[in-house]
């Protein structure tokens, strides 16, 4: 059970285990003496939540269903998760712009502000490896929710929300730069942190650690399994 704005509501359902992570950095057989190399940790995502969601969350969900119409709502909202007092609507990626525009414009919703875009890479979430999360805020109603959209590694396309929330401009560029998510419809989807000719996306879980020359003084950072251990 969780508490959402003082009203008891249903928490997340059974966690969905998508991977088992061994070691802190994925390196094996290294000279690591910290003990972190022996860590074994399950990677799990929160499960879907039952009603009542708690607090204003039920009002938001009902208002969105009324504004979209039940058929479009059912085709758009894949799952609802209440976890740590936060409401997350998992949205079918093709429906993201219409859902975001409805959340922004409907008088009962009025989520006028998108606070950014965060990327996450879950290699164990088969067919949904790349996630993009959008925290939204209603200044009118003083409420917060989150949208989340997933795409597979082999088709990393998600519609841009620039036309709905122009503030996502640089955030989508950064998420593209670091995770390789392609935001279709973005007016200028170019790298924003890494050099234009950089190969790969460095915050993905499959991006190699170390072994990249540090050009400004000629040193080299070795991969974790080649690093020297100090006692």
UniProtKB/Swiss-Prot annotation:
Main location: membrane
Pfam families (alphabetical): Complex1_30kDa
Domain of life of the native organism: Bacteria
UniProt KW keywords: Cell membrane, Membrane, NAD, Quinone, Translocase, Transport
InterPro entries: NADH_DH_suC (IPR010218), NADH_quin_OxRdtase_su_C/D-like (IPR037232), NADH_UbQ_OxRdtase_30kDa_su (IPR001268)
Entry's EC annotation: 7.1.1.-
Membrane topology: Peripheral membrane protein
Reactions that this protein is recorded to catalyse: a quinone + NADH + 5 H(+)(in) = a quinol + NAD(+) + 4 H(+)(out)
Similarity annotation: Belongs to the complex I 30 kDa subunit family.
Described function: NDH-1 shuttles electrons from NADH, via FMN and iron-sulfur (Fe-S) centers, to quinones in the respiratory chain. The immediate electron acceptor for the enzyme in this species is believed to be a menaquinone. Couples the redox reaction to proton translocation (for every two electrons transferred, four hydrogen ions are translocated across the cytoplasmic membrane), and thus conserves the redox energy in a proton gradient.
Name of the protein this chain belongs to: NADH-quinone oxidoreductase subunit C
Origin species: Mycobacterium sp. (strain KMS)
Encoding gene per record: nuoC
């Amino acid at each position: 059970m969780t508490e959402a704005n003082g009203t008891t509501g249903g928490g997340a359902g059974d966690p969905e285990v998508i991977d088992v992570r061994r070691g802190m950095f994925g390196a094996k057989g290294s000279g690591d003496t910290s003990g972190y190399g022996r860590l074994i940790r399950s990677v799990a995502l929160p499960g879907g939540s039952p009603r009542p969601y708690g607090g204003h969350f039920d009002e938001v969900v009902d208002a969105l269903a009324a504004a979209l119409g039940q058929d479009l709502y059912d085709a758009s909202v894949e799952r609802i998760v209440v976890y740590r007092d936060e409401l997350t609507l998992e949205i079918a990626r093709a429906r993201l712009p219409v859902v975001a525009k409805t959340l922004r414009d409907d008088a009962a919703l009025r989520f006028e502000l998108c606070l950014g875009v965060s990327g996450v890479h879950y290699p164990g979430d088969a067919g949904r490896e790349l996630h993009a999360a959008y925290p939204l805020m209603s200044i009118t109603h003083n409420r917060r929710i989150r949208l989340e959209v997933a795409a597979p590694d082999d088709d990393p396309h998600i519609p841009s929300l620039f036309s709905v929330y122009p503030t996502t401009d640089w955030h989508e560029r950064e998420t593209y730069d670091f995770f390789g998510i392609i935001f279709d419809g973005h007016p200028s989807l170019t790298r924003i942190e890494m050099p234009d000719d950089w190969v790969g996306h460095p915050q993905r879980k499959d991006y190699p650690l170390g072994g990249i020359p540090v050009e400004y003084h000629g040193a080299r950072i070795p991969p974790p399994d080649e690093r020297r251990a100090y006692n």
